[in-house]
Amino acid sequence: MESFIVYSVLAGVIALIFAFMLSSFISKESAGNERMQEIAGHIHDGAMAFLKTEYKYLTGFIVIVTVILAIFVGWQTAACFILGAIFSIFAGYFGMNVATKANVRTAEAARHSQGKALNIAFSGGAVMGMSVVGLGVVGIGIMYYIFGGNMEFVTGFGLGASSIALFARVGGGIYTKAADVGADLVGKVEAGIPEDDPRNPAVIADNVGDNVGDVAGMGADLFESYVGSIISALTLGTVVYANKEGVMFPLILSSIGIVASIIGILFSRKSKAKDPQKALNTGTYIGGIIVIVSAAILSNTIFGNLKAFFAVASGLVVGMIIGKITEMYTSDAYSSVQKIANQSETGPATTIISGLAVGMYSTLWPIVLISIGVLVSFFVMGGGSNAMVGLYGISLAAVGMLSTTGLTVAVDAYGPIADNAGGIAEMSELPHEVREITDKLDSVGNTTAAIGKGFAIGSAALTALSLFASYAQATELESIDILNTVTLVGLFIGAMLPFLFGALTMESVGKAANEMIEEVRRQFKTIPGIMEGKATPDYKKCVDISTAAAIREMILPGVLAIVVPVAMGLLLGKEALGGLLAGALVSGVLVGILMSNAGGAWDNAKKYIEGGAHGGKGSEAHKAAVVGDTVGDPFKDTSGPSMNILIKLMTIVSLVFAPVVLQYGGILLNLIK
């Protein structure tokens, strides 16, 4: 086994050992009093019940796709697909299991100090982060070694990761938002009870949803991004460089990224900063600096120049700036969110209008930055004289952006753990000071989640672009002629798909939320003593509604993302499929940014008012902001984040089925001719 494969697998194993150590640390902490443990037990059971049901359905999907791959593409690709799917499931399961233990321990720690609570919540998130990167590089390293570096087979691993990620993100998003919308509209607006009030029948489902969507779903999303970026770099690196330096560089860089993430996590955990945001930022910046310095040394050692370093640095810097810009559009410390809060004074309509405007504005700078990142990485690598080398540079920018994924996921998954801790504190009637600490941690979590979503969409654009280049190479497409009618048809259909996908997922949340609202209203009417706190609501019924709706509604969007590219390639040929991928990439990135940022801005405008601005809780402005937040929920937590996976999944499906499209593509064209 070549040394660079050994290094990458070893780094992955170290990440998994570190995750296990953090998990053990969390388990040893106190889980609080009996009431806290009872509530946490309900949340844990609900989350695990959902995962078991989801995985049961996904097993059937994995079997069907494996058989199709084995027959039409090859058993080797099918084997890689199975491993990618299983590892994606493992990453979600490990992360969710620990997150549902860390939440109650964070609430208990908040009774003692903010620092201790932050440490536990962040450690819980770090388990997810380390599981994602550890399983990612171990899986790719093993498959690369077993199949002798044949990337045609290893792309199957990416397909497995991507398809599970889409179902996890969509299913988790529908679950969490059905519960959230139901709990908010009936609980807050109609019944006038506060958030996380134990009298609300949907409150447990809402807290389960935080884990299902924002821990397992988000983890699977970034697992897929991480794996996809490495696979695209390896695929192009194999073509461009004869002596394996094109493969060696991304694998060793990913290994260094894991070590840098571990160091960053340790710094954040030991930080003495009073502001939780500063503590989290410390680790992120340290991890980023280690990767940039290492990339310079590595680039000079492997390639004898700094070209690869500049490509990697462009990706990492663009990712960090997009994260900061996302914060500026979604944090209540900046004018965009404050404007939405101001517009809430005149009712829900102006709240919605201003939120949509913020979402649209927020597409400008990320797209400009992604474009700069693409240009820099393409030309600095030598794309002017050799296009394939330039495209390899773009894939390195994606690897650079995702090199500290372990840290990104840790910071991102910390948010829902802190949110859950606040819910447990409220339901357990812990002192007001505890809720103040968890609220502070949660508000930082909202910002980190928004930054994470910005990072995810930026990396999705670069990863999909480099996978698209791999597809063009696999199907022997020299260029895509947009004056070609067939390509134009593909472009139109591709550009439409993110809107159709968004409509399906938004409608699914609406349907599921409707069921939830009816159930919560029924319980308020038919169970005497709920409002007085004398009777316990039927929490399980609401959990079951969310689970059933999420599983039912995730199937169509998921199947669509896989079937449409294959159908397009078979019916209209490789040029039309190339057009479809380009159209979906452009519109998917824009729709994803708009939805994620508009939703985040509405959410924080509501929190800004709850902090005392514009009349505070219970005011007319607050009621309007709650409506905005409710509309924004499926925007930012279901449809928006799903766009990243959609564009990457369609590209990797096309790459895996490229041999089939090359052999049988254009059936309809041949009939017409």
Curated annotation (Swiss-Prot):
<comment type="function">
    <text>Sodium pump that utilizes the energy of pyrophosphate hydrolysis as the driving force for Na(+) movement across the membrane.</text>
</comment>
<feature type="site" description="Important for ion transport">
    <location>
        <position position="214"/>
    </location>
</feature>
<dbReference type="InterPro" id="IPR004131">
    <property type="entry name" value="PPase-energised_H-pump"/>
</dbReference>
<feature type="transmembrane region" description="Helical">
    <location>
        <begin position="127"/>
        <end position="147"/>
    </location>
</feature>
<feature type="binding site">
    <location>
        <position position="629"/>
    </location>
    <ligand>
        <name>Ca(2+)</name>
    </ligand>
</feature>
<keyword id="KW-1003">Cell membrane</keyword>
<feature type="site" description="Important for ion transport">
    <location>
        <position position="648"/>
    </location>
</feature>
<feature type="site" description="Important for ion transport">
    <location>
        <position position="221"/>
    </location>
</feature>
<feature type="binding site">
    <location>
        <position position="636"/>
    </location>
    <ligand>
        <name>substrate</name>
    </ligand>
</feature>
<feature type="transmembrane region" description="Helical">
    <location>
        <begin position="364"/>
        <end position="384"/>
    </location>
</feature>
<comment type="subunit">
    <text>Homodimer.</text>
</comment>
<keyword id="KW-0479">Metal-binding</keyword>
<feature type="transmembrane region" description="Helical">
    <location>
        <begin position="553"/>
        <end position="573"/>
    </location>
</feature>
<dbReference type="GO" id="GO:0005886">
    <property type="term" value="C:plasma membrane"/>
</dbReference>
<keyword id="KW-0460">Magnesium</keyword>
<keyword id="KW-0812">Transmembrane</keyword>
<keyword id="KW-0472">Membrane</keyword>
<feature type="transmembrane region" description="Helical">
    <location>
        <begin position="387"/>
        <end position="407"/>
    </location>
</feature>
<keyword id="KW-0106">Calcium</keyword>
<dbReference type="GO" id="GO:0009678">
    <property type="term" value="F:diphosphate hydrolysis-driven proton transmembrane transporter activity"/>
</dbReference>
<keyword id="KW-0630">Potassium</keyword>
<keyword id="KW-0915">Sodium</keyword>
<feature type="transmembrane region" description="Helical">
    <location>
        <begin position="652"/>
        <end position="672"/>
    </location>
</feature>
<feature type="transmembrane region" description="Helical">
    <location>
        <begin position="449"/>
        <end position="469"/>
    </location>
</feature>
<keyword id="KW-0406">Ion transport</keyword>
<keyword id="KW-1278">Translocase</keyword>
<feature type="binding site">
    <location>
        <position position="419"/>
    </location>
    <ligand>
        <name>Mg(2+) 2</name>
    </ligand>
</feature>
<keyword id="KW-1133">Transmembrane helix</keyword>
<dbReference type="GO" id="GO:0000287">
    <property type="term" value="F:magnesium ion binding"/>
</dbReference>
<feature type="binding site">
    <location>
        <position position="180"/>
    </location>
    <ligand>
        <name>Mg(2+) 1</name>
    </ligand>
</feature>
<feature type="binding site">
    <location>
        <position position="633"/>
    </location>
    <ligand>
        <name>Ca(2+)</name>
    </ligand>
</feature>
<feature type="transmembrane region" description="Helical">
    <location>
        <begin position="84"/>
        <end position="104"/>
    </location>
</feature>
<dbReference type="GO" id="GO:0030955">
    <property type="term" value="F:potassium ion binding"/>
</dbReference>
<feature type="transmembrane region" description="Helical">
    <location>
        <begin position="3"/>
        <end position="23"/>
    </location>
</feature>
<feature type="binding site">
    <location>
        <position position="207"/>
    </location>
    <ligand>
        <name>Mg(2+) 2</name>
    </ligand>
</feature>
<feature type="transmembrane region" description="Helical">
    <location>
        <begin position="62"/>
        <end position="82"/>
    </location>
</feature>
<feature type="site" description="Important for ion transport">
    <location>
        <position position="169"/>
    </location>
</feature>
<feature type="site" description="Important for ion transport">
    <location>
        <position position="637"/>
    </location>
</feature>
<keyword id="KW-0739">Sodium transport</keyword>
<protein>
    <recommendedName>
        <fullName>Putative K(+)-stimulated pyrophosphate-energized sodium pump</fullName>
        <ecNumber>7.2.3.1</ecNumber>
    </recommendedName>
</protein>
<feature type="binding site">
    <location>
        <position position="603"/>
    </location>
    <ligand>
        <name>Ca(2+)</name>
    </ligand>
</feature>
<feature type="transmembrane region" description="Helical">
    <location>
        <begin position="279"/>
        <end position="299"/>
    </location>
</feature>
